[in-house]
Structure formats: C-alpha cells, structure tokens
C-alpha cells in the first residue's frame, strides 16, 4: 500500500484538536450554563480520562460511583448512563432511582456473567440491584478481548464460545427470575452468524443484545446489515461513529464525535428505531489512539478461516470510499489536554444527536 494514501488523510494535529476542544467547551461538565438535554445517554467508558484526572486530584473520589456518574451525565446534557452498579443497599438504590425518575434519565447496568456455579451468588446480587434500580438493561460481554488479538486459532474461539454458552445458561434462570434484560454485546468476538446462533440457542426472553454499531465492522460484517440483523434482539445500544483509514496491514478504526466519522448515523438510527422504537441508546466514544484491524495478516485470518473474500473486499472498499478526514491520536498528550478533548468529543456528539438525529 502506498504511503500517499495515508498522507492524504492526516491524523488530527494538536492545534486542530485543541480548536475542536475550544469549539465545544460551552457545554462540558464544568460550564456555567446547563446544556440542553439529549435523550442519548453515556457509557462510563466515555469518561475514563476524566475519572483518572479527578482521582489524581482526590484519590477518594470516584466519578463512576453510580449516583455521582448519573449526576455528571445530567450536567453535561446526556439522557442517562450505563455503568457498573455492583451491589447497592436500599438507601443508595432509592437515591439513584429517585434521581433518575425525577430527571427522566435512563439507567443501564454493566455486569460480568457468572463464571461458574460458585459465582452465581455474586451475579444474582448484582442482578437484584439492577432490578431494584429499574434498569433498561444490563450490558455484558461473554468472550474476552478482540477475536483477532485474543485468539490464535478457530479452535480457541470455539472453546471460548462454549464457555460463553455455559455462562449464559447459568445466567438465564436468574435474569428471568428478576425480569432483568441481560444484553450481550457484539464485542469484536463473534461474527454476525455466530452471534445470531447464540441468541437462538439460548431462546431466553431476557437475554438479548447490546448492539454496538461499530464493532461488527472489525470482523468484516456488513456495516449496516449487521445492525439490522441484531436490532430485533436489542435491549440497549452502544451508539458510535467511527473514523476509518487504511494502513499497511488492514485498516484503522477510531472513535470520533458523531457525524464526523465514516458511518451514516441517520441510517443507523433509523434501523434501530424501526426495530425498537422505544429503546434508549448510549453514546460510546472512547477518546484514545486508533485501533488497528490487521485484516491483511495471516494471524487475523487464523480465527476466521471460512470467511469469504468478498467480505474482505466489501470492507476495504467501504474504508476507501468513506475515509475520515482526521483521526485523533492523543496518547502523547498531557492528561489535562486529553480530558479537555474527551469532554469536547462528548459535547459535540450530544449536540449532533440532539440537533441532527432528534435524540
């Protein structure tokens, strides 16, 4: 691959990124005026840099404490949150639920699935808390890491899938008992056909999907077809735009503010709303350096030997036809500048969701 393709779409310069920060500073958390509200909530991972920055100032303060984070989401103009709730006592449950009801905010939880019989008590305690809080859903992941990084062969993938099935079979009676929707994310772990087969095998009313609108692209699934196929199973959504660019071993995939990336967010919104008109979605935008998807390497294909070449061709064609103008590379920045960009990314996304997507 020629280097001039990379040079035609440079990464965001520090000056350009700081200009983006300045443009969005009017509605971040520490602004003096309360921003307008979007229905789009925030996944806790969006604010990981701010959490780290705040803990450096005060090690005892945790932005991700559920009520603290829900108030932060309200303050920046988001419509709710997705975060780990853990196990909360009755007073904390009441405070969280009352605040959410008063402010009309959605709450999603995050939970680890039960590893084995010995882990069921922990899992049920967290699900009971989620039920008492009144969550829309509880998001989970059942396979570790990104498929093309975590595993070396298809056999390893199949072994992890078997463990995932066992964990979800353990979880099913508990989430059914408490009537809590367990939403399994497409986490760059299974291709679309594999994930649909998992849902059909489980056939549980309370096990469905966290539809991540970008992850399936990393496994060469059709960018919009995957969302359409997963949408009927959706209990919640990781709503994201992503910037694409070729590199010598495949393509780069980077979270970017809504409307600034390579995907048609209006089309994605329409697909999801058509299938689930009342679903409340959560922005997932992790401010970090781009991820590498090495789809032109032997190691990548070792875990997906039966995927056809036309899927690769479609994916690379999409990357070439929809290159983002900029990518954000922030790893070398100071923590203070990173948190400013993180705030600005969230602010710009909520503004786009509110003004363009009517969310």
Roles of regions detected by a PLM:
Residues 24-32, 88, 102-108, 114-208, ...:
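Active-site acidic/histidine proton-transfer and metal-coordination neighborhood
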Residues 82-93, 113-121, 148, 186-193, ...:
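Acidic-and-aromatic substrate-binding clefts and catalytic sites of carbohydrate-active enzymes
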